[in-house]
Amino acid sequence: MLSRREMGALCASLLFCLLLSLGAGWAQSQLTTADQLAADTLRLHIRADTDSVRDQSAKLAVRDAVLALTDEACPADSRADARAWAAENLVRFELTARQTLASLGIRTPVKACLVNMYFPTRRYDGGALPAGRYDAVRLNIGTRRAGRNWWCVLYPGLCRSACGGYDTPAENDLVCGEYIVRFRFVEWWDGLTAPREDVVLAG
């Protein structure tokens, strides 16, 4: 028969194993949701030429023009539709950006491409997206591309807010919930495992 001390040690061991099992299950569910989130999201990445007031203002003007284009023409039924439309309209993105810059008296190269790239955690109105690799439409303005970047969500939400726009409750919960341990865990794991190299998919 087990002594009281041995019984206490056994109960503590069983409790530890139970908590470890629950923690592993929770961690796996967060990683699975984060992976699904990345698969259901199309992002926008605009790189300015420099940090000068002129170039940063130009970047924001291009942003507004691109958002107007996507609001008007981009299908929003699914991420797959949005991605296919973006890949087919990269020249249109470039033309829109060049016309916007020309209206400001700026003549500089613009390159649009579809990439898979690593994003840090970003906060948006009503929610946030965890760090990880996402597909994105990227616009490079100029040749130096040394200025501050601008990120947002093209689908879902068209850069307004991603909150509530996903198919599953778990995805919406991860995006729209409070920035707590679950985000920290996803960030920590992606920091260890996610490659940082950009992969050009089109353009």
Language model features with spans:
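Mid-length scaffold segments of soluble, non-membrane domains
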Residues: 80-147
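Short, Lys/Arg-rich N-terminal segment immediately upstream of the first membrane anchor
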Residues: 1-6
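Structured segments of extracytoplasmic/periplasmic soluble domains
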Residues: 49, 65-76, 92, 96-107, ...
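Soluble extracytoplasmic domains of inner/organellar membrane proteins
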Residues: 127-181
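Hydrophobic membrane-insertion alpha-helices, especially the h-region
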Residues: 8-25
